[in-house]
Amino acid sequence: MDKKLKKYIERYDLIQNCANYELKPNGGMIVLINQETECEIVIANSVYALASFQAVLINAYEVSVDIQANRALNLIAIRFKGAGASFFYEGEMERLMQMPKAPIFIEKNILENELDSYFKNRLTASQLPFNIMKIIDLLDTQGSDYNIDEVMAIANIPRKILDKIFNLRTGLSFKTYASLSKLDY
């Protein structure tokens, strides 16, 4: 894998020689590329058909995603770090937030031997506004516990950037804000 892509992509997994496969949760989004066999993706008891040579973007998930076919599968699973997929599929992020449990069908005919060049061509600087609050809201609606370090990992944002933006928005550093919020009135 190209060095530049390693910042956003955890790894490429080949899924072959089996008719059923279970994708374990990893905390990041996944692009699933079907290289050959028509199959079904089962997410939260909903079934989605995946045609030959079709690719889908699957949101981060808490329970396993099952893949089923009548013959041997031939898939590639691209596992992203945190919100790394948003740098490649920014246009799909709004749909993904509206339907977080449904896969987003993205493209056809992505070839295994051209993955690095495909992702290098798709890589763009994010134009989305700073959206940590959107992530916190999503975690709240799912009833998840979280801390700021987990949110930053999901958003793929370094602590230094968060501190700078927090200071710009509030006029205070985290340390000053924390000491003020502990004062009893």
Predicted features along the sequence, with ranges:
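Basic/polar phosphate-binding segments, predominantly the helix-turn-helix DNA-binding elements
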Residues: 149-183
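Alpha-helical bundle regulatory/interaction domains
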Residues: 1-149, 155-159, 173
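Short, intrinsically disordered, charge-balanced linker/junction segments flanking boundaries
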Residues: 96-101, 179-185
